[in-house]
Amino acid sequence: MSLKHITAILVLTGMLFSSNTLADDLSDVMKVIQQYGDLENDLAAQAKLMRSDRVYISGGARQTDEAKNMANQITGRQAGESLNGGKTIFVTMIEDPEVSIYGKTAVASFVRWWQVYPHRKPSNLSPPTWVTLVLVKEKSKWLIAHTHISGVGGN
């Protein structure tokens, strides 16, 4: 077999495996996005999707201490539920996710809103928000390193 044939086989093999890896990574990132939404009712479990150095930007505030950020979110949720007299249920809708993968880094952008069911109160639909996540692959697991949330124009 000539050097040209060997080179061609190696290049084609590399292309075959890299496209499969990209497809697997895309599927894995999409699963993390879905879990991120599905775990809105369990913020402690949702926190396991985050890197310890995650940056969180929302409502004009930037938080770089992930442990304190999650503690604040959990405490805020508990305080709201205490005022409502019971658990609030969040049903998360994620629409039109777009994901780009750059090696071990992924950028995801999507629209998110919640149907919120407070205890003993009427349900309400939150305004839609843009969510951008930056995920980093550590070993075989994708974790959220950066979250940016902002209102969709006109809200």
Question: Which positions does each model-derived feature cover?
Answer:
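Short, low-complexity N-terminal intrinsically disordered segments enriched in polar/charged residues
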Residues: S2, L10-G14, S18-S52
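A solvent-exposed, acidic/Ser-Thr-rich amphipathic alpha-helical stretch
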Residues: L26, L43-Y102, S123-S126
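Sec/Tat-exported extracytoplasmic proteins
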Residues: I33-N41, D53, S58, R77, ...
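Short beta-strand segments enriched in hydrophobic/aromatic residues
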Residues: M50, R112-W114, H148-G151
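A short hydrophobic beta-strand element
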Residues: F90-T92, K104-W114
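A short, structured loop/turn motif at beta-sheet edges
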Residues: V99-V107, P122, L135-L143
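Short, cysteine-centered beta-strand-loop-beta hairpins and adjacent loop/turn segments enriched
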Residues: Q115-L125, G153
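Short beta-strand edge/turn micro-motifs at domain boundaries
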Residues: P128-N155
